[in-house]
């Protein structure tokens, strides 16, 4: 079905095509025809962060920034859906055009800039959702006009608002499209921010009588020293999990493409190698008590298995869906199932 729709969608610019695809998914959900678009995978229960996921394949943040499509997306067969990135105040993001396809590479470049309607709107949307069939992550960020020195207040505000509704919360400090945001990954800044948010998390757990896991999403462009420093901080502060990785600012593998010079984060197939290297190094540096979600470059079941082999407990797709459609979800679940049932049991490979 998606193979028939893709030429139509690709006739539009990438951001417009995303909106049309979401509208189609919503229509299928409302009319009970989602089965024509995607086949729900056989459950593959997977534990992580103290939660039980129906299957280990999720949707990465960015597609549903305001939580407007949660039920329709879960109906496609995802084990979990991550919405956002959401900020305290609404913001328009960067000027359009700000999303570009590189079909020859199964890649996307975006410089969206945390465009969203604000956390209060997202909360209302989540409250309306039925949330059947999977878990919900909420990805939080800071407004672009909030200086890094005051970033903690933005993250804290968002965490307080979404805490009662989220199955897990992701702290996004790694988007390349908000000026200066990645500076929060530097060791001392990271330690200050995460220490404060861990205190907030524990206070909210006491207030609400439940503990919602807090994850941190990191960039693929960290060098080995930066990865080791980040791992040290995240282990010291006992975060619940890490998502590896966000998009990359490097263009080495797509340098010949006419869109390669567009500013923004590159995602899709060219990101697979670098994001998986970061994932593998983090797995070697972090205690087993901190699970990892592998994201970046998954366009096949084999790619999902590569993430699991590098140490991921769960995986997420996004750009791969642009090129493969919803069938990618079931393909990834089935590939991970075969790996799990293999005699080796899926041990992590060497660094």
UniProtKB/Swiss-Prot annotation:
Enzyme nomenclature, EC number: 1.3.5.2
GO biological process, one term: 'de novo' UMP biosynthetic process
UniProt catalytic activity: (S)-dihydroorotate + a quinone = orotate + a quinol
List of residues binding substrate: 65, 110-114, 172, 177, 246-247
Broad enzyme group: oxidoreductase
Membrane topology annotation: Peripheral membrane protein
Cofactor section: FMN
Pathway terms, separated by semicolons: Pyrimidine metabolism; UMP biosynthesis via de novo pathway; orotate from (S)-dihydroorotate (quinone route): step 1/1
The keyword Cell membrane is annotated on this UniProt entry: yes
Note accompanying the cofactor annotation: Binds 1 FMN per subunit.
GO molecular function, one term: dihydroorotate dehydrogenase activity
Keywords assigned by UniProt, alphabetized: Cell membrane, Flavoprotein, FMN, Membrane, Oxidoreductase, Pyrimidine biosynthesis
InterPro entries in the cross-refs: Aldolase_TIM (IPR013785), DHO_dehydrogenase (IPR050074), Dihydroorotate_DH_1_2 (IPR012135), Dihydroorotate_DH_2 (IPR005719), Dihydroorotate_DH_cat (IPR005720), Dihydroorotate_DH_CS (IPR001295)
Biological role: Catalyzes the conversion of dihydroorotate to orotate with quinone as electron acceptor.
Subunit structure: Monomer.
Family per similarity comment: Belongs to the dihydroorotate dehydrogenase family. Type 2 subfamily.
Annotated HAMAP family: DHO_dh_type2
Name of the protein this chain belongs to: Dihydroorotate dehydrogenase (quinone)
Organism: Xanthomonas campestris pv. campestris (strain ATCC 33913 / DSM 3586 / NCPPB 528 / LMG 568 / P 25)
């Amino acid at each position: 079905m998606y193979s028939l729709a893709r030429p139509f969608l690709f006739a539009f610019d990438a951001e417009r095509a995303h909106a049309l695809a979401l509208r189609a998914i919503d229509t299928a959900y409302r009319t009970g025809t989602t089965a024509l678009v995607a086949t729900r995978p056989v459950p593959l229960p997977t534990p992580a962060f103290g939660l039980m996921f129906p299957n280990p394949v999720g949707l990465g943040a960015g597609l549903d920034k305001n939580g407007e499509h949660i039920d329709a997306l879960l109906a496609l067969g995802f084990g979990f859906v991550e919405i956002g990135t959401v900020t305290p105040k609404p913001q328009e993001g960067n000027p359009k055009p700000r999303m570009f396809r590189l079909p020859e590479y199964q890649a996307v470049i975006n410089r969206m800039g945390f465009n969203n309607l604000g956390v209060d709107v997202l909360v209302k949307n989540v409250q309306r959702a039925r949330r059947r069939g999977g878990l919900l992550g909420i990805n939080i960020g800071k407004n672009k006009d909030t200086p890094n020195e005051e970033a903690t207040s933005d993250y804290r505000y968002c965490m307080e608002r979404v805490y009662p509704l989220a199955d897990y919360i992701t702290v996004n400090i790694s988007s390349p499209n908000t000026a200066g945001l990645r500076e929060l990954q530097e060791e001392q800044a990271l330690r200050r921010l995460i220490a404060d948010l861990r205190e907030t998390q524990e206070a909210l757990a006491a207030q609400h009588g439940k503990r919602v896991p807090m994850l941190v999403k990191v960039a693929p462009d960290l060098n080995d020293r930066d990865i080791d420093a980040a791992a040290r901080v995240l282990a010291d502060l006992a975060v619940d999990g890490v998502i590896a990785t966000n998009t990359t600012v490097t263009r080495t593998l797509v340098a010949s493409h006419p869109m390669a010079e567009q500013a923004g984060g590159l995602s899709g197939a060219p990101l697979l190698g670098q994001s998986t290297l970061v994932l593998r190094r983090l797995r070697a540096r972090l205690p087993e008590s901190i699970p990892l979600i592998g994201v970046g470059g998954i366009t096949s079941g084999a790619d999902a298995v590569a993430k699991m082999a590098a140490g991921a407990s769960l995986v997420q797709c996004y750009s791969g869906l642009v090129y493969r459609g919803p069938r990618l979800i079931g393909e990834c679940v089935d590939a991970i199932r075969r790996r799990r049932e293999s005699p080796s049991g899926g041990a992590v490979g060497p660094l």
